[in-house]
């Protein structure tokens, strides 16, 4: 199976394999097979549109985890200039699962922070599979306070299965680190724009996800627990992850419907990994619009709006 394609994409993979085979034959043959290639390409596009028009929540979760999906550093390289990464929380250590630093966005100085997963085994281990420890969140907090001091807008990119639940992380105050970030971000006196680019896993995502605008890429997810974890608790079997994904309402469309996010950023046909440049362009447009909107606001008005947004989540009913 081609690793670029997920199980539900296999009909697409088979068509693309045929196209590649014809191209290979066409290079050596005297006959012109371009017409057949064009026909198959049109069929492939139509099939892809059909499959992606009716994705289940579980299939979206698989896309959000795709191994070739662009990560934070991929977007930083495409959207920002003069990026200078800063390291360490000035208390314990540097956590490579969180990256961040100073950069320029369309020439404007900003602070950018995000989760970072790994591509190969070595990098996955170094990045702890994108699961931050307390020092990662404290590093993010240090950068946000730095941004506030110099009145720099903050961009955060969310892509994590969740905060690391190891014994050492708990001993060093994982829950306190997350809670402190929530508190500080709610009152940060500078624009904060958050984007879920892959997995938005529970408190590990929320710890850099409180802002003036929360956006999601079309095939990203945001939930309190992974579908497998939920299924294991409710039905004692991770095999019912697809049922859990539907029940959790993890997709961007469902979360927008519930009012938990503000904007859905469209992805290229087939997902962000199929055309990272186009995805970066779509993301740039959304970030630029948000930055223009919130940079023009008075600080007190910005904070009042942010507080109102947070207090608008959910509803209270007396029994």
Swiss-Prot record:
Enzyme Commission designation: 2.1.3.15
Gene Ontology MF terms in the entry: acetyl-CoA carboxylase activity; ATP binding; carboxyl- or carbamoyltransferase activity
Pathway note: Lipid metabolism; malonyl-CoA biosynthesis; malonyl-CoA from acetyl-CoA: step 1/1
Primary site of residence: cytoplasm
Any one Gene Ontology BP term: fatty acid biosynthetic process
Any one of the GO CC terms: acetyl-CoA carboxylase complex
Record keywords, A-Z: ATP-binding, Cytoplasm, Fatty acid biosynthesis, Fatty acid metabolism, Lipid biosynthesis, Lipid metabolism, Nucleotide-binding, Transferase
Positions of the CoA carboxyltransferase C-terminal domain: 32-293
Catalytically driven reaction(s): N(6)-carboxybiotinyl-L-lysyl-[protein] + acetyl-CoA = N(6)-biotinyl-L-lysyl-[protein] + malonyl-CoA
Broad EC category: transferase
Annotated Pfam families: ACCA
Cleaved signal peptide residues: none
PROSITE patterns assigned to the protein according to its UniProt record, in alphabetical order: COA_CT_CTER
Location in or out of the cell: Cytoplasm
InterPro entries named among the record's database cross-references: Acetyl_CoA_COase_a_su, ClpP/crotonase-like_dom_sf, COA_CT_C
Record function comment: Component of the acetyl coenzyme A carboxylase (ACC) complex. First, biotin carboxylase catalyzes the carboxylation of biotin on its carrier protein (BCCP) and then the CO(2) group is transferred by the carboxyltransferase to acetyl-CoA to form malonyl-CoA.
SUBUNIT field: Acetyl-CoA carboxylase is a heterohexamer composed of biotin carboxyl carrier protein (AccB), biotin carboxylase (AccC) and two subunits each of ACCase subunit alpha (AccA) and ACCase subunit beta (AccD).
Family, similarity comment: Belongs to the AccA family.
Name of the protein this chain belongs to: Acetyl-coenzyme A carboxylase carboxyl transferase subunit alpha
Species annotation: Thioalkalivibrio sulfidiphilus (strain HL-EbGR7)
Gene, per the UniProt record: accA
């Amino acid at each position: 199976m081609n690793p670029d394609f997920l199980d539900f994409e296999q009909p697409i993979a088979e068509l693309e394999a045929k196209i590649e085979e014809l191209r290979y034959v066409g290079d050596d043959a005297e006959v012109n097979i371009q017409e057949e290639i064009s026909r198959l390409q049109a069929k492939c596009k139509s099939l892809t549109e059909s499959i992606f028009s009716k994705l289940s929540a579980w299939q979206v979760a698989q896309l959000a985890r795709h191994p070739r999906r662009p990560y934070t550093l991929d977007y930083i390289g495409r959207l920002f200039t003069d990026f200078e990464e800063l390291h360490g929380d000035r208390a314990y250590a540097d956590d490579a699962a969180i990256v961040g630093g100073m950069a320029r966005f369309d020439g404007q100085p900003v602070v950018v922070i995000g989760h970072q997963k790994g591509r190969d085994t070595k990098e996955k281990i170094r990045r702890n599979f994108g699961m931050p420890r307390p020092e990662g969140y404290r590093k993010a907090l240090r950068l946000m306070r730095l941004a506030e001091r110099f009145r720099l807008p903050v961009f955060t990119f969310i892509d994590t299965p969740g905060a690391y639940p190891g014994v050492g992380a708990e001993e060093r105050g994982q829950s306190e680190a997350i809670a402190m970030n929530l508190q500080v971000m709610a009152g940060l006196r500078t624009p904060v724009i958050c984007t879920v680019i892959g997995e938005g896993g529970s408190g590990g995502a929320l710890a850099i996800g409180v802002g003036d605008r929360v956006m999601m890429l079309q095939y990203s997810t945001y939930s309190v627990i992974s579908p497998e974890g939920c299924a294991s608790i409710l039905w004692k079997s991770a095999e019912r992850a697809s049922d859990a994904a539907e029940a959790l309402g993890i997709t961007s469309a469902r979360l927008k419907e519930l009012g938990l996010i503000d904007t859905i950023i469209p992805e290229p046909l087939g997902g962000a990994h199929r055309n990272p440049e186009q995805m970066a362009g779509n993301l740039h447009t959304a970030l630029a619009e948000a930055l223009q909107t919130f940079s023009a606001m008075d600080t007190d008005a910005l904070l009042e709006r942010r507080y109102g947004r947070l207090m608008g989540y959910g509803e209270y009913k007396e029994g």
